[in-house]
């Protein structure tokens, strides 16, 4: 396995610089007539560096050589690190230290205060005592960041390898009932592998904040949460809007049609590389933030 992994990694590393340069040229050509200042800022960075990354801004450079402290749990065999003062486990998919380090670099980059992927800000945050749904929990970094603020955390994650890691990361909180893990995909219906926002709302009686980062399933998840959106006066949402080319438009329209929310989006653009064939728009907004209008008594970014 390690030999196959090593060969695959070498092949990917060999082709990656070419692909990044190719995409840099394609993106610059696609946006050559743009007058959007934020687009022009990205293009300037791309032209200067002659490459295309997910985050084409100077802030990303400070994590390029970041090294996180790692150790291996003897009992489970999983790698773990310290994340903002908390122990955080990696899934079994990360079976080399270099893979763990690269993953941590990506987490820190996407949650940098200047990142288009940043979930929270000083003015858009989880309130003390909130019940929070972390959909697409993965390694659990979002939940760890708000662990002290939230009264309850509901982690929705369908990847079995991440489930094992999450149970280790949140063992103490699970034991006292502060954290519950739902091993399903958040969607617009309920069955053995899917769960809806409205089902969780009915089960727990209160949900104040939902983070949606579910690899393109955000629209379906919102369709399954109409009752919650209409009935919860404290509702807040942080919704990833870049996984599909048209995601931003549809998610914004869906939330706007509810006529309930103050909507905003994160500053800047990010590039989300497709597995097979990249489709425009190549530069996409990272997140849409939604706050029930009753709560808007101050400025949200």
Describe the residue ranges of each PLM region.
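A short acidic, amphipathic alpha-helical/loop segment
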Residues: 145-149, 169, 221-228, 250-254
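Active-site beta-loop-alpha junctions enriched in small/polar residues
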Residues: 187, 242-244, 268
